[in-house]
Amino acid sequence: MQVTVETLEGLERRLNITVPAANIEDAVTAELRNIAKNRRFDGFRKGKVPMKMVAKMYGKAVRQDILGEVMQRHFIEAIIKEKINPAGAPTFAPVENKEGSDLVFNATFEVYPEVELKGLENITVEKPAVEVKDADVEEMIETLRKQQATWTEVEEAAEAGKRVSIDFVGSIDGEEFEGGKAENFPLEMGAGRMIPGFEDGIEGKTKGMEFEIDVTFPEDYHAENLKGKAAKFAIKVNKVEARQLPELNDEFVAKFGVAEGGIDALKAEVRKNMERELKQAVKNRIKEQAIDGLVKENEIDVPAALIDQEINVLRQQAAQRFGGNVEAAMQLPRELFEEQAKRRVVVGLLLGEVIKAHELKVDEEKVKAIITEMATAYEDPTEVVTYYEQNEQLMNNMRNVALEEQAIDAIIAKAQVSEKEVSFNELMNQPA
């Protein structure tokens, strides 16, 4: 076998491979003999059919199969010989394929980028200095009260904190548009659910009032046909409601699974949950900055094959979120996923290089700690830990999580780390 390697654009490579004719012809002959020996032919005893007849009937198909097998096998031998690491399946193209002549073919494919980590010392990480304060717990209790609130109709004007039930019809240039019409639509005033100006137009209105408002859809509105358009809404207020918050008593506390200890026990449970969420949020914020810095300092080419694979993964995940229709999800345009897919591939390649450069191995104690911490969110943590320990696939997933955390720790060890005081709400409400 003769092999030459061509470097094409970017990460693309081409192997030019020559296989001696004898290799092909010997393989074809062996397969034809196998057919003659084991297949029945009319008018002949098994194994007694003439080889010329077998070759005439099956020679062409057998040769095509053999060529495919030979190209695949010799490609693998070639990349091992040349120490090449393909990032995806090759595309084969025969160049010389005459019977009795050497087989000449090429294989075009992408390789993984060569990554040399740099700039870890330039990465800046602001570690949030934050704790759960009494005021944060009280605010969370109020949020829980609002979630359990009831609404009572009142003879008052619409304002922030109240809820209105409205009918509305939207139009642009006098024409109604799709999605711009509703009846008995519940709208909590001050929640910011509607486009700018919509709630302002309802402010101060009372039950039975009918009126029109003029608004403009934002330029970044999700519906392409409405972006930046001026619209008119005809609105009728059917009723105005005020929120009735439940009292902080044992009945309220019991709704959250706290059987004893009253409101103090609920506050303690809420604080514990908030502290667990806060710890994870701090970890996520640090990880996000470390990865952002890693990507910024290390620009690399990305194999298109890996991006395609990741796009398919994202499509399948989308299908699971939206009813399991994989076929429909696979038809979604790749542009929806391309940026996220490329980012995930880049991060994966760079973190892999961090792991390699620092010779990191999975810390089994860290794996146990991650599982134990995660299990505290469940009613029976011991049962959860046991379930994970008895499931090898879940354990391998957790080992990957632990190894990634070890890689992040390695980045942070070389980065410029400072602390910044923030409140609980500031951190938890930061955009992703």
UniProtKB/Swiss-Prot annotation:
Name of protein: Trigger factor
Cell membrane as UniProt keyword: no
MF terms (GO), sorted A to Z: peptidyl-prolyl cis-trans isomerase activity; protein folding chaperone; ribosome binding
Enzyme class at the top of the EC tree: isomerase
Functional summary from the UniProt entry: Involved in protein export. Acts as a chaperone by maintaining the newly synthesized protein in an open conformation. Functions as a peptidyl-prolyl cis-trans isomerase.
HAMAP family linked to this entry: Trigger_factor_Tig (MF_00303)
GO biological-process terms attached to the record: 'de novo' cotranslational protein folding; cell division; chaperone-mediated protein folding; protein transport; protein unfolding
PROSITE patterns: FKBP_PPIASE (PS50059)
Catalyzed reactions: [protein]-peptidylproline (omega=180) = [protein]-peptidylproline (omega=0)
Lineage: Bacteria, Pseudomonadati, Pseudomonadota, Gammaproteobacteria, Vibrionales
Statement: the UniProt record of this protein carries the keyword Cell cycle: yes
Entry keyword set: Cell cycle, Cell division, Chaperone, Cytoplasm, Isomerase, Rotamase
